[in-house]
Amino acid sequence: MGGKQRDEDDEAYGKPVKYDPSFRGPIKNRSCTDVICCVLFLLFILGYIVVGIVAWLYGDPRQVLYPRNSTGAYCGMGENKDKPYLLYFNIFSCILSSNIISVAENGLQCPTPQVCVSSCPEDPWTVGKNEFSQTVGEVFYTKNRNFCLPGVPWNMTVITSLQQELCPSFLLPSAPALGRCFPWTNVTPPALPGITNDTTIQQGISGLIDSLNARDISVKIFEDFAQSWYWILVALGVALVLSLLFILLLRLVAGPLVLVLILGVLGVLAYGIYYCWEEYRVLRDKGASISQLGFTTNLSAYQSVQETWLAALIVLAVLEAILLLMLIFLRQRIRIAIALLKEASKAVGQMMSTMFYPLVTFVLLLICIAYWAMTALYLATSGQPQYVLWASNISSPGCEKVPINTSCNPTAHLVNSSCPGLMCVFQGYSSKGLIQRSVFNLQIYGVLGLFWTLNWVLALGQCVLAGAFASFYWAFHKPQDIPTFPLISAFIRTLRYHTGSLAFGALILTLVQIARVILEYIDHKLRGVQNPVARCIMCCFKCCLWCLEKFIKFLNRNAYIMIAIYGKNFCVSAKNAFMLLMRNIVRVVVLDKVTDLLLFFGKLLVVGGVGVLSFFFFSGRIPGLGKDFKSPHLNYYWLPIMTSILGAYVIASGFFSVFGMCVDTLFLCFLEDLERNNGSLDRPYYMSKSLLKILGKKNEAPPDNKKRKK
């Protein structure tokens, strides 16, 4: 009865793969797949390139990278090449009117003249009454105070220049931050109109001190990297060696290591059960019950009631029981999983070039991200600059008839205007053109292009690695039958025939990810809503989309393996992979969990080892090191430690992603091998002898005078 039921289940998920005498691993004679999707993808990329060209033609990222003076000219460029900093004549008017940081980021809307300077003022200075009658040249130019607006004549009196706001009336010790001169908080400002006390000024400047501190911190961080970059590279090299050794040694220690890890998980769960029981017993004796607490939104309060620890105890006990039952009844499948891990280690050892393919993926991902970032930046800064007339005090005599806020030419000479302080200032960028009106849509196009290209690059890496590892499994005589350049052959084959299939799978995943991003945006906007029903619905939607994304990633991964082997289109490959996995669902679950546990331990070993070594080295806690190996003196010794840990995690993830792809590929090949062959002379198994031994199978030995042909 059990065999009949199993046959019916197999029929529900398709028929087993039939024997094909012509099959010798990844098919070489194949044709292009999903051509329509390939054409759409190439057209989309062409449009993406056009968007980038348009953004480059119309965009001007200098407004983000460089500050502008009152006339809209860039500091540090062109005629102001030797004047990289921006000085505000009266920065307190900025502080009193708005947030200076937002003013600096959103344009020159600060109500005070601004001028490009070669260096920020270092000493405090205020115009004295006895200097009002002197000329600008005597007070400013000859005393190296080159802070007036361009074009102010030498013979103009100081009082006139101050009335027209052509020169500053005071200077404060300042330091550059964000390309602008900001004063320190401990300076004493002069008496200014509209400011009644120093507290207002101090409160305003305190908003700037974070930027200045950030500048100091950034300088120290740069110094630390300059001092420790060599040792960070050494730490990353150690991470690379550890990752490689861990994978290569799995063929020797996979079995004992998996057993130790499983026993370790059992031990952790057992300790958790013991701890929960002790907490439950103490609270039970105290009589602390949830009925006394009632309902509360303070989750930490539930730690003080016995029901919480009882529920945790039950959950951990159930998990412990499930794991024990799996260890008892699924030990055969665990042995198969261990054997596949050993086989994957051998495959990686035979094709060491696969371990460095993540570098190719990383470079391609970096190109995609950099292209999107530059395109988005240029699009955001597209538009023609707009200039308007502006005066600090429009009620001054002579300003009544001046058309304030009307368009003007910044090159016009306004010094002799009857309105004091009248200037043609930069207002912003025009949004009237076709490109400017379409910026939002083009940005959406760019985001879609970012997700699609990133997913396509990841799909390319998975399919290429699958093709290389499949050629290893289906080589009957190893290593003689393995192709000479399996990775390069798989790369060329994938690009030539299956660009469309990869684009199809990447597009499906992209649409789900875009939906998740939109949902996260809606959730962020509705975060203030207190309706519990709405929050619950939103949480359910987010959970469903997260599960859908995980499932599609899993399905795509196995579909790419089938594409690499058989050269079918995406839908057929996804269907065949899904049916094959469902016919062996228990083996799939066991292998997946064993592999996840092993790779998690591997990452923990590599990252933890590099982290511990980095900590003891950079903190100077390793005695006896020679002069050449002495740790550098750092401002923040944790900075290279965290950098080393992050780099080690990235390296370990790259290496173990290759190993994980190898395991998945060999597993699908193993399942097909079981269905396709029977061990006879005509249909021998391709799996290793250890797998044959675990399964209780063997290949029929050929006669002495014959050699098996494959």
UniProtKB/Swiss-Prot annotation:
Site location (Breakpoint for translocation with NEU1): 308
Q: Which reactions fall under this protein's catalytic activity?
A: choline(out) + n H(+)(in) = choline(in) + n H(+)(out); thiamine diphosphate(out) = thiamine diphosphate(in)
Q: What is the effect of changing residue 409 to D?
A: No effect on glycosylation
Listed under GO cellular component are: apical plasma membrane; extracellular exosome; plasma membrane
Write out the annotated subcellular location. Answer: Membrane; Apical cell membrane
- Per its UniProt entry, which superkingdom is the organism in? Eukaryota
Residue intervals on the Extracellular side: 56-229, 274-309, 380-455, 523-560, 619-638
Instruction: Please indicate if the UniProt record lists Manganese as a keyword.
Output: no
Q: Which residues are glycosylated?
A: 69, 155, 197, 298, 393, 405, 416
Q: Per the record, what is the consequence of mutating residue 6 to L?
A: No effect on thiamine pyrophosphate transporter activity
Q: Name one process (GO BP) from the record.
A: otolith formation
Q: Name one Pfam family in it.
A: Choline_transpo
PTM note: N-glycosylated; N-glycosylation of Asn-69, Asn-155 and Asn-393 is required for a proper thiamine pyrophosphate uptake.
Task: Write out the tissue specificity statement of the associated record.
Answer: Highly expressed in colon, also detected in prostate, trachea and lung. Isoform 3 is also expressed in colon but a lower levels.
Q: Which UniProt keywords apply?
A: Antiport, Cell membrane, Deafness, Disease variant, Glycoprotein, Membrane, Non-syndromic deafness, Transmembrane, Transmembrane helix, Transport
Q: Which residues lie on this side of the membrane: Cytoplasmic?
A: 1-34, 251-252, 331-358, 477-501, 582-597, 660-710
Q: Which GO terms describe its molecular function?
A: antiporter activity; choline transmembrane transporter activity; thiamine pyrophosphate transmembrane transporter activity
This protein's major location comes to membrane
Q: How does it sit in the membrane?
A: Multi-pass membrane protein
Q: Briefly state the protein's biological role.
A: Choline transporter that plays a role in the choline-acetylcholine system and is required to the efferent innervation of hair cells in the olivocochlear bundle for the maintenance of physiological function of outer hair cells and the protection of hair cells from acoustic injury. Also described as a thiamine pyrophosphate transporter in colon, may mediate the absorption of microbiota-generated thiamine pyrophosphate and contribute to host thiamine (vitamin B1) homeostasis.
Q: Which disease is it linked to?
A: An interstitial deletion causing the fusion of exon 10 of CTL4 with the 3'-UTR of NEU has been detected in two patients affected by sialidosis.
Q: Member of which family?
A: Belongs to the CTL (choline transporter-like) family.
Q: What is this protein called?
A: Choline transporter-like protein 4
Q: Which organism is it from?
A: Homo sapiens
Q: What is the lineage of its organism?
A: Eukaryota, Metazoa, Chordata, Craniata, Vertebrata
Protein encoded by which gene:
SLC44A4
